Amino acid sequence: MAVPKRKTSPSKRGMRRSADALKAPTYVEDKNSGELRRPHHVDLKTGMYRGRQVLEPKEA
C-alpha cells in the first residue's frame, strides 16, 4: 500500500489547494458583434469562432 514517506508541509498543501478556489469566469468582447463571450468559445448568437462560421446563428 502506498504511504507518504514525509509529512506534507503546510506550504505544499496550500500550493496544491490554490487551484481549488472559485474564480469569476472571464469574458471578452466579441470583435464582430460586441457581445460578451467566453474566450476560446463559440459566440452562440452569431455562430462564429476564430473568423469562421461553425454553427447556424440562433433566430431571435
Curated annotation (Swiss-Prot):
Belongs to the bacterial ribosomal protein bL32 family. Residues 1-60 are annotated as: Disordered. NCBIfam families: rpmF_bact (TIGR01031). Keywords: Ribonucleoprotein, Ribosomal protein. It comes from Chelativorans sp. (strain BNC1). It comes from the Bacteria. This is Large ribosomal subunit protein bL32. The lineage of its organism: Bacteria, Pseudomonadati, Pseudomonadota, Alphaproteobacteria, Hyphomicrobiales. GO terms for biological process: translation. GO terms for cellular component: large ribosomal subunit.
